[in-house]
């Protein structure tokens, strides 16, 4: 467990975190994506981040959680070379927590001898990842229902080893 600031603590995901992580992801999807994506796309995001997927990613990768005063405020996962499920509770966004989580996930990737990370960025997240040095590899458009498209970006970043 690592103290980030006087109020924040980061640690590895435990299975006992599952309900809170799923609730955080669902809430963040509802507040951040509903304004930019049509309803079926929001439903698609909910299905993509269901409990079995969260458990599988945590078991095969590196998932972290961030707490403040005992309340979960953020989570992020690296599964192999892919970053997934980086979510910060809406009330806690724009405080550097997402950037801190990405630094933690990138550091763990370097420790695992991974030199490049990739991710799929939603429309609201694209600028965040660009600021962190990720580059757009491709623009994607997936029709989840007639006339309802999931637009997103495949992005990647070469990690600089400290050596």
Regions found by a protein language model. Give the residues of each.
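A short beta-loop-alpha structural element at the N-terminal edge
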Residues: 8-23
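Residue-level recognition of the GNAT/N-acetyltransferase active site
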Residues: 14, 84, 89, 120-122
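Conserved GNAT-fold acetyl-CoA-binding loop/helix
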Residues: 22, 26-52
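Conserved beta-hairpin
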Residues: 61-74
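Conserved acetyl-CoA binding element of GNAT-fold acetyltransferases
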Residues: 79-91, 99
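Conserved acetyl-CoA-binding loop-helix of GNAT-fold acetyltransferases
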Residues: 94-107, 131
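C-terminal "cap" of GNAT-fold acetyltransferases
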Residues: 115, 120-124, 132, 142-163
């Amino acid at each position: 467990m690592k103290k980030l600031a006087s109020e924040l603590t980061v640690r590895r995901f435990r299975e006992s975190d599952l309900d809170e992580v799923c609730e955080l992801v669902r809430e963040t999807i509802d507040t951040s994506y509903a304004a930019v994506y049509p309803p079926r796309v929001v439903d698609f995001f909910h299905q993509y981040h269901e409990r079995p997927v969260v458990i599988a990613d945590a078991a095969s990768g590196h998932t972290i959680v961030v707490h403040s005063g005992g309340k979960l405020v953020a989570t992020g996962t690296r599964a192999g070379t892919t970053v997934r499920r980086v979510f910060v509770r809406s009330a806690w966004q724009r405080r550097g927590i997402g950037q801190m989580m990405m630094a933690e996930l990138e550091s763990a990737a370097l420790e695992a001898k991974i030199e490049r990370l990739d991710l799929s960025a939603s429309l609201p997240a694209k600028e965040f990842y660009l600021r962190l040095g990720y580059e757009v590899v491709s623009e994607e458009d997936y029709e989840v229902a007639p006339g309802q498209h999931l637009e997103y970006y495949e992005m990647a970043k070469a990690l600089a080893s400290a050596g």
